[in-house]
Amino acid sequence: MDGNVPILVRRTTMEETLDVEAKSHVEMFHHYFFTLAPDDKYIRYTMEKAMYLVDETGLAQYNTLKEKGFYSNIVGTSAVFSIFCDSITFNKEKMEFTYYGRQRIERRSNILMRELVTAGQLKRVPRTENNPHGLLIVNWRTLLNKDIEQKTKSNY
């Protein structure tokens, strides 16, 4: 401190913070891609945000789900999807990650929990307002997406 003014002790480089930035980027992408509400505009908004963080492998997955009517079904059934990150492993040398999480799907009559594991690599790109970490997920794929628990909701 210089009087009441804080002094910048040391600047950090992206290399020093890569592990934290990579995990944050991966978690942010999964939040946007897998948090869904029964609202067309919200789904378009979150998918647009997610697409800034991933290469064409994410777009291909989105288009496949869209063609199958997945997003229309969410709106039609008033389903709400939430994602919970359990952990993310990141190999700095290979720039590879594995995401481990759970997805909660709440429908009118039941709540379904799914286990989700995805993997991919990260590529450095310029930082932008839409991609603040300066990373792009490439070769993204789902390794596991299975039901782990289903509960019937009580009608009051």
Predicted regions and their residues:
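Solvent-exposed, amphipathic alpha-helical segments
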Residues: H25-L36
